[in-house]
Amino acid sequence: MNPTERITTPHKTGEAKVIIFSAPSGSGKSTIINYLLAQKLNLAFSISATSRPPRGNEKHGVEYFFLSPDEFRQRIANNEFLEYEEVYTDRFYGTLKAQVEKQLAAGQNVVFDVDVVGGCNIKKYYGERALSLFIQPPCIDELRRRLIGRGTDTPEVIESRIAKAEYELSFAPKFDKVIINDDLETAKAHALKVIKEFLGIDTE
């Protein structure tokens, strides 16, 4: 199954905003997001739903909303997701509309870390209320070097991630802003500036 392409009626313009991050694995996206969440920007991370079991000390409603595969399918049928993906049989990930609306209603600017298709879907749903950012590695060779440097994946997994990254990079023009992460501190500063401008915060 491919990620859903279903788009529902956009939300009316409000004060709180939506900030979407997508990127290939190894681009430094998570590091940049964690840096931004630590700034005083009233940002709140969007908690995804998943049908996989909790790992270790993971708690429902903290790391993820844990649903059974049948519960996930029922919520899909009820059109409760902004976006979702079945990565393989019975292993779903997605973003629940009600949770995001709850955060926005509380005045929080909601940050998403999603795949490129999910990012495009959320941007379509929220329109001008959303800023979509694509974090891009300087080149595929550098991405391969970073993935090898992690020391967590087999060569086969790394090549699979590289192939996926080449597909994901083709989506970059669909995003509002592309931030090239060839230097992490520069990329963090660039992302901070772009988000402050979007939120109407003085960047001086």
Swiss-Prot record:
Record keywords, A-Z: ATP-binding, Cytoplasm, Kinase, Nucleotide-binding, Transferase
Chief site of localization: cytoplasm
Entry annotated with the keyword Disulfide bond: no
Subcellular location: Cytoplasm
Annotated source species: Bacteroides fragilis (strain ATCC 25285 / DSM 2151 / CCUG 4856 / JCM 11019 / LMG 10263 / NCTC 9343 / Onslow / VPI 2553 / EN-2)
PROSITE patterns (UniProt xref): GUANYLATE_KINASE_1, GUANYLATE_KINASE_2
Gene3D superfamilies: Guanylate Kinase phosphate binding domain, P-loop containing nucleotide triphosphate hydrolases
GO MF term set: ATP binding; guanylate kinase activity
Enzyme Commission numbers on file: 2.7.4.8
SMART domains reported in the protein's UniProt record: GuKc
Pfam families associated with the record: Guanylate_kin (PF00625)
Keyword Kinase: yes
Record-given protein name: Guanylate kinase
Sequence positions that bind ATP: A23, P24, S25, G26, S27, G28, K29, S30
Gene transcribed to yield this protein: gmk
A GO cellular component entry from the record: cytosol
Function field: Essential for recycling GMP and indirectly, cGMP.
Family: Belongs to the guanylate kinase family.
Source taxon at top rank: Bacteria
PANTHER family, sorted: GUANYLATE KINASE, GUANYLATE KINASE-RELATED
Domain Guanylate kinase-like per the UniProt entry, residue ranges: 16-196
Catalyzed reaction equations: GMP + ATP = GDP + ADP
